[in-house]
């Protein structure tokens, strides 16, 4: 890519926004040019707006410290200088849906970390190794929004991203029953040990809302685009997922243990072979973050 894409971060002062900032530092493809947050933060430098709330394990990158934060509610102005937006905004779901659609209607693509649009039928919820063909639904979404370039795409819940690629690799063996336990870091709750000291040496065996997401979202990921309806139809085959989601005293990184029953017999050697040799359309793109 000869010229970097200019990107903005909506919700830049929060923990997910901070993670975007660290991930995009010195990125060969993207240049962060706009940091948007609440009206309370607008007009301040990023360092002033965040203050002592920087939660990353590495220092705040120099490139953002003196950038002036803009009001994320002013979608037209914020979007005018970017090629697309990363959304990490933290607000009620209906407000997230509304503001992300406002940005899309400025003809700005929105890539969202939020859950608000995950079940909007014409919004793709993508795990690149599994379902990049779901991007085809964007054509229908644009018709609904009245846009030619703007759209919304989302990522799924963080708890399913570790194990769903394995299910895709073993698709030929027809996974029928999945029993998964996830052990989720406190960063998933937007916390560090500094502001959640009760988690040191502690385990919480239930995370509100996570089990429903872990059981239902894979069905949309494994679904298909219905061109006639202009939406993604969740997988309705013989697949049952049961989950338990546990908060553990780890700062970053989730772990999942998965027990599977298949419709077709498979040997250990066959399962290993399919994992090792699994490829997808995403593999052809040579993405910087692709697993090697």
Predicted regions and their residues:
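Short helix-capping and hinge/turn segments at secondary-structure transitions, especially at repeat
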Residues: 219-227, 263-266, 276, 280-284
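N-terminal Rossmann-like NAD(P) cofactor-binding subdomain of oxidoreductases
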Residues: 1-206, 239-240, 268, 273, ...
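Conserved small/polar residues in nucleotide/adenosyl-binding loops
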Residues: 291-292
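Oxyanion-binding "anion nests"
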Residues: 210-259
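A short beta-turn/strand-edge loop motif at beta-sheet boundaries
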Residues: 211, 266-267
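Short, well-ordered beta-strand elements within core beta-sheets of diverse protein domains
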Residues: 87, 256-263
